[in-house]
Amino acid sequence: IVWSRDQRRKMDLENPKMRNSEISKQLGYQWKMLTEADKWPFFQEAQKLQAMHRE
């Protein structure tokens, strides 16, 4: 969610006429193409946000 939130904003600005469903498909594809090492910082950020939310 952390990654897609930022990427969705960028994609929406770059492609204002693109439908939300198409943006979601593109984001899903891009996420799958990332390596585990590329994904790791976003997993860490999500864990940090979860911990803050629990407090």
From Swiss-Prot:
Transmembrane segments: none annotated. SMART domains: HMG (SM00398). Signal peptide: none annotated. The keyword Transmembrane helix does not apply. Residues 1-55 bind DNA. GO terms for biological process: cell differentiation; sex differentiation. Pfam families: HMG_box. Gene3D superfamilies: High mobility group box domain. It is found in: Nucleus speckle; Cytoplasm; Nucleus. GO terms for molecular function: calmodulin binding; DNA-binding transcription activator activity, RNA polymerase II-specific; RNA polymerase II cis-regulatory region sequence-specific DNA binding. Keywords: Activator, Calmodulin-binding, Cytoplasm, Differentiation, DNA-binding, Nucleus, Sexual differentiation, Transcription, Transcription regulation. GO terms for cellular component: cytoplasm; nuclear speck; nucleus. Belongs to the SRY family. Interacts with CALM, EP300, HDAC3, KPNB1, ZNF208 isoform KRAB-O, PARP1, SLC9A3R2 and WT1. The interaction with EP300 modulates its DNA-binding activity. The interaction with KPNB1 is sensitive to dissociation by Ran in the GTP-bound form. Interaction with PARP1 impaired its DNA-binding activity. Transcriptional regulator that controls a genetic switch in male development. It is necessary and sufficient for initiating male sex determination by directing the development of supporting cell precursors (pre-Sertoli cells) as Sertoli rather than granulosa cells. Involved in different aspects of gene regulation including promoter activation or repression. Binds to the DNA consensus sequence 5'-[AT]AACAA[AT]-3'. SRY HMG box recognizes DNA by partial intercalation in the minor groove and promotes DNA bending. Also involved in pre-mRNA splicing. This is Sex-determining region Y protein. The gene is SRY.
